[in-house]
Amino acid sequence: MVRDQIARRGITNPRVLAAMTTVPRHVFVPSARQDEAYADRPLPIGAGQTISQPYMVAYMADVAGVEPGMCVMEIGAGCGYQAAVLAAMGAEVFALEIVHELAEQALPLLSSFELANLHYHEADGSKGWPDAAPYDAIIFSCAAPSVPDAVFEQLAVGGRLIAPVNADSGDHQTIHRWHKTAGGTLHQEKLISVRFVPMTGAIEE
């Protein structure tokens, strides 16, 4: 999977590739989908949600510039696969998931990995996780019409925020990357077109 689906598509960061090799995707995939666990596509995990395709998990970690020792927040953590990969890269990870059914499944699974640097919490990601801020990187694993101000405020100076943005309510989105400068200014760039499940919670109001 790592060689054929990720490295050959341009992800060469050794930390990303090592983490993708270390974290077994099949344990996050429902039993009925085990034969597809290492296919490069998203798979349903219940509650209308999906586990992201392996390439996209690697891509998000790569463009966020995640390095060991960084403080990273993930919003829309779902089953916990992306969070586990980020933790395997050596980051201190704070993962948020609003769907109770998914959080209930993810918590014992992630505990079995015994990753002291991975913290998973059931909560509305639109408010972020202010107690652990600021974050060197913030990754949205769900699509939002815009990034809440409360989340931007939790991004550290020099940090990067990666989010699929769906401004027109269509099925497809564009991943945007913001970088916060020393003066607190946010520089934005558009990266690639994607398709993520929509963010829920206060962002819908």
Question: Model-found features: residue ranges?
Answer:
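Class I SAM-dependent transferase core
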Residues: 1-73, 81-85, 89, 102-112, ...
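Conserved nucleotide-cofactor-binding alpha/beta core module
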Residues: 65-187
